[in-house]
Amino acid sequence: MTFRHSLAALAVLLLSAALQADEAKPVDATPKMAYGLMMKQGDRLIFSPCRDRSYANVEDVSADGSVTRVLNSVGLDAGKRLYVELLGVLDNGTLKASAFNMARVEGRCQMPGGKEEAWRAAGNDPAWALVAGGEHVRLQRYGKPEVVLPYAEFRSDGNISRYDGANDHARLAVRLDKTICRDAQANGAFAWTASVELNGQILKGCAWQR
């Protein structure tokens, strides 16, 4: 065998080994949050990730198809395009969704909150919004001063997460229950139901993780 033939044979062996390594590479089975737009085409559920031109089929692997039921309640089955945040595993072009964080009709992409945001919550009558993460918990209410308290990681007890904070002027208690919350004004559904108590006033709404 000539030197040239030896190099060619070695190249074939290396290429074969690389292909086998790629084929043997296991799928990361750790569920991660997927952010993107979702629609139904015939019997298929199509997911398009934020800031990405790729597409993936969606397979609902949640218990009793709970993810699909929630999305259909927002309008997926009726042909509406949704912005969704789904917990799942991407496997060979299929997003296997096991849980949902939020879904809104024609909503815009929201990238992960990172270190600055762990939770968001909002409600109506009266209008309010809460952002928790980083160094602060901020509560905004229509026509009233913003309340800012030091952030501390929410305490988890089963399907309930809590936060308590206070300063010289405000005492705040936040309770988040992992039960589906629907907001007709926001045209969406969220994975958590929020109850916020500020100096004895109770505010109700929905919450989602960031």
Task: Give a label for each model feature.
Residues 1-8:
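Bacterial N-terminal signal peptides that target proteins for export
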Residues 8-16:
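Bacterial N-terminal signal peptides
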Residues 29-45, 88:
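Structural detector for short beta-strands of small beta-barrel domains
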Residues 30-32, 67-71, 111-115, 120-127, ...:
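Charged, amphipathic alpha-helical segments
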Residues 36, 75-99:
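Flexible glycine-rich surface loops and low-complexity tracts that mediate binding to linear polymers
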Residues 50-64, 121-175:
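Central antiparallel beta-sheet cores of small beta-barrel/beta-sandwich binding domains
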Residues 92-95, 183-189, 193-200:
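Short, exposed beta-strand-loop hairpins at the edges of beta-sheets
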Residues 93-113:
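OB-fold/S1-family single-stranded nucleic acid-binding modules
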